[in-house]
Amino acid sequence: PLSEEAKIILTNNFNNTDQILVPDLILYELANAWATKTKFSPYRVKNNLKDLEEINLSIEPVSLDLIRKAIAFSRRYKVTVYDATYVILAKGKKCKLVTADDKFVMQVKLPFVKHLSEY
């Protein structure tokens, strides 16, 4: 239902009006999902990787300092360290975190964490 908003974000990224910033752990998460949670053929996985490269994500390395902050955030807000990593990265880079996770937005209640429908 929110695919149009997601397409706008991707289009803005392609047009260099917005940048999509992600922690490098997204690469492991996607690779793991494609390898263990789907029945994608090797060809499909290869195409997914090509598509991912074309999106031109700004991939930020995860540091021990970021993980320390994510752990503290995770405990305070009762969210996963994985999700907290995105919050800490967005906060540190002074950018918005856009998510389709209603529960997460309501749980953290931070002004820079926006629901995809607000984009």
What is the role of each PLM region?
Residues L21-V22, P61, V81-A84, T99:
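Short beta-strand scaffold positions
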Residues I26, L66, Y86, K103-F104:
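Alpha-helix capping/helix-boundary segments
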Residues E60, V87-Y119:
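Acidic, PIN/NYN-like endoribonuclease modules and their adjacent C-terminal/linker elements
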